Amino acid sequence: VRYGLRVDGSNLEEMNSNTRTEGFGDEVKRRIMLGTYALSAGYYDAYYGKALKVRRLLAENFIDLYQKYDVLLSPTSPCTAFKLGEKVNDPMTMYVNDICTIPSNLVGHPAMSVPFGKGSNGMPIGVQILAPPMQEPVMYQVAHALEMASE
């Protein structure tokens, strides 16, 4: 491993295992396990084929939207940011709070989140900017404008 975290081991397999054990938080490990289970024998055909179809349909819908709009805006999360460490032992809340980012992740289009004001609890509100493929410069311009407007 020449980039990122590297945890030593007596051989390559042990090094990879140690690095992944130390480098991934509990939430990432849970999601990897869920994905592995869903794609395991008996579930692959039931879920993977349907997921590919949904992904294709979503991508087509996004392309249609980009014919009318330069970028799309959405909340990044259904609520404000949590205080550091506040929800680490609540996996369902952690999962639900990135629900707004799933469409952009599925279609593989550029997306980013920027802070846009604060909620009544004083915590930041995130707005997600989604752009067509290869239109990152437009996305960055919108992000900059939103950040300037919210200061």
Role assignments for model-derived ranges:
Residues R2-L106:
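Serine-dependent amide/ester hydrolase catalytic core
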Residues M33-E60, K68, L106-E151:
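Structural helix-boundary/capping segments
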